[in-house]
Amino acid sequence: MKKIGLFGGTFDPPHNGHLLMANEVRFQVGLDEIWFIPNHKPPHKTDRKRADSRHRVKMVEAAIESNPHFRLELIEMEREGPSYTVDTVELLKKRHPEDEFFFMIGADMVEYLPKWHRIDDLLQMITFIGMKRPGYTGSTTYSLLFADVPAFDVSSTLIRQRIMQEKPVDYLLPKAVERYIKEHHLYES
């Protein structure tokens, strides 16, 4: 039986903060692997245009290729419609009944858990790991594991803005992702 951390996100683009969080959680919780799951259509993000799904998948591939403990899981890309975590977890548990799954969420999402689609069902299926971040209490009535992740103040939004403003993004995202963004002219104004 493997212990697998599920890390869902738009990854638009994936950055060094994502990799740092995944690596720290894997180490602190004793997970065998982290599966990065790009969202097809995140239900909580409907207000902006994202990079095309195929570009986001290619960027995640580029970001994680050097870490043997990281894997790309396309389960949410295979489905149409909103990407609800409960549907993803149900399907993964059917496909991999021998494995134990953990779902990684940022401290900002811990406070949002009561609003998650079918949260009570989800809590019966999986253990959540809250990644502590400065500025968020991470307070909840739910039973969660917590991981202390070093502060690395970067976001995909910041990176997209810097690219649009033609500012450098060195050290914010993996070089392979930066090359991919430049080759495909993503996020340019």
Curated annotation (Swiss-Prot):
Biological process terms in GO annotation: NAD biosynthetic process
Catalytically driven reaction(s): nicotinate beta-D-ribonucleotide + ATP + H(+) = deamido-NAD(+) + diphosphate
Listed EC numbers: 2.7.7.18
Superkingdom of the organism of origin: Bacteria
Pathway, per record: Cofactor biosynthesis; NAD(+) biosynthesis; deamido-NAD(+) from nicotinate D-ribonucleotide: step 1/1
UniProt-recorded Gene Ontology molecular function terms: ATP binding; nicotinate-nucleotide adenylyltransferase activity
Record's keyword terms, sorted: ATP-binding, NAD, Nucleotide-binding, Nucleotidyltransferase, Pyridine nucleotide biosynthesis, Transferase
Alphabetized Pfam families for the sequence: CTP_transf_like
Family to which the UniProt record says this protein belongs: Belongs to the NadD family.
Annotated function: Catalyzes the reversible adenylation of nicotinate mononucleotide (NaMN) to nicotinic acid adenine dinucleotide (NaAD).
Protein name, UniProt field: Probable nicotinate-nucleotide adenylyltransferase
Lineage: Bacteria, Bacillati, Bacillota, Bacilli, Bacillales
Gene: nadD
